[in-house]
Design a protein with these regions (language model features):
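Conserved donor-binding/catalytic core segment of Leloir-type glycosyltransferases
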Residues: 5-7, 144, 190-206, 212-216
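Carbohydrate-associated surface elements
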Residues: 149, 170
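Acidic donor-binding loop of glycosyltransferase active sites
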Residues: 251, 257, 268-286, 301
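Short His-centered aromatic/hydrophobic patch
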Residues: 91-97
Length: 376
């Protein structure tokens, strides 16, 4: 019988960074140990059935599209805990659902673990959300953090520092490995052109606009350079406008959304990976970690990352790549040119990045730490 209740808004079939993090940990918990309580999504039936068939994980869908710690939801969770003799609760994201911890303990939960991501950082900066983080910290046994940046934001609100433990998303270093993507390059008309690749949702914070704006300076030194943007999002129209403004239609290639299985090959199209992320809204919207930097390192590419939030935790500046100010076009273009002009440097940084990913970021490392927090 299951002993762990996972409560989360971030679950499939919808794709996303937090969803991948939660699912990666769930797949590495012993079979039959977990019941999932999550929000409603359309066309979820076959997805939920696969969890039951493959992992003996029962998925229960609430009627709402977004779970909040309302009295109704708390009653549903309490009933699940009592009916299934559940003793452990795992929150896929501490905010906001972790606020329910106090009431779940009354129902019989004896151990509660909550993950944090990027959004808890801005919660920690604004009252009454900062108060909620403090309350969650009081009630849970462990509150995870991604890296030094998220820890520094959370620490002032958590009286018992021993409750803070590091659990970050893992990398499947077998899946994300160096690959020969020449056929893919040929398909997209790139051939052997020096290529920068960026993967991520097309939004302001990810810095695709700055890559386009920095490209004319790159082209002064490397006239045939190409920029490949993988992903989709609301910023696409603005990015199209920048391509037209700088007359870069022959240099910028929009790939759109791709399947997870194809991602390593698309990353491998690049000679350099770049995502100069930047903070927004006076530091309230930041990069929590930037798992895609680590995926690119695992694929053997040197990485240029932005200095937003926790992104520097994912790039060893000067070793696996460079960390730049995501608003500094000169810094962005300078590091791109440096890497595209020096095959030996690219190879050395790429090899160090792959080694670092294997030694420090594999799923086996982080899932072991997480399972220990749940006492399994």
């Amino acid at each position: 019988m299951a002993s762990i209740l996972l409560v989360t808004n971030d679950f499939g079939p919808r794709a996303g960074g937090i969803e991948s993090f939660v699912i990666g940990l769930l797949e590495r918990i012993p079979v039959g140990e977990v019941v999932v309580y999550t929000s409603f999504q359309p066309d979820h039936e076959s997805y939920d059935q696969k969890w039951l068939s493959d992992y003996q994980v029962r998925v229960i869908r609430d009627k709402s599209k977004v779970l909040l710690p309302t009295p109704r939801v708390i009653r549903e969770l309490q009933a699940l805990i009592r009916q299934n003799s559940i003793t452990k609760v795992w929150f896929g994201a501490a905010a906001p659902l972790g606020v329910a911890s106090r009431w779940l303990r009354k129902a019989g939960a004896t151990r509660i673990v909550a993950l944090t991501h990027g959004h808890e950082v801005w919660w920690s900066k604004i009252w009454p959300f900062s108060w909620a983080i403090s309350e969650i910290g009081k009630q849970v046994d462990y509150l995870t953090y991604l890296g030094s940046f998220t820890k520094s934001a959370l620490s002032p609100h958590i009286k018992d520092a021993s409750k803070l433990i590091r659990v970050a998303p893992g990398i499947d270093t077998d899946h994300f490995s160096p690959s020969d993507s020449m056929s893919l390059r040929q398909r997209h008309g790139l051939g052997s052109r020096p290529t920068i690749v960026s993967v991520g949702r097309l939004v302001h914070r990810k810095g695709q606009d700055r890559l386009i704006e920095a490209l004319p300076k790159v082209l002064e030194s490397i006239p045939d350079a190409a920029l490949v943007l993988v992903g989709e999002g609301p910023y696409r129209k603005h990015l199209d406008g920048l391509v037209n403004k700088y007359d870069l239609s022959g240099n910028v290639f929009f790939i759109g959304r791709i399947n997870f299985a194809e991602l390593p090959n698309y990353i491998g199209m690049g000679d350099v990976f770049a995502m100069p992320s930047r903070s927004r809204l006076f530091g309230l919207e930041v990069e929590g970690l930037g798992i895609v930097y680590l995926e690119a390192s695992s694929c053997g590419l040197p990485v240029i990352g932005g200095s937003s939030g926790g992104a520097p935790d994912a790039v060893l500046d000067g070793e696996t790549g460079y960390v730049v100010d995501g608003n500094d076009l000169t810094a962005i273009s300078t590091q791109i040119v440096r890497l595209l002009s020096d095959a030996k440097l690219r190879k050395e940084m790429g090899e160090r990045g792959r080694k670092w990913a294997i030694e420090n970021w594999r799923w086996e490392i982080w899932s072991k730490e997480f399972n220990k927090s749940l006492d399994i």
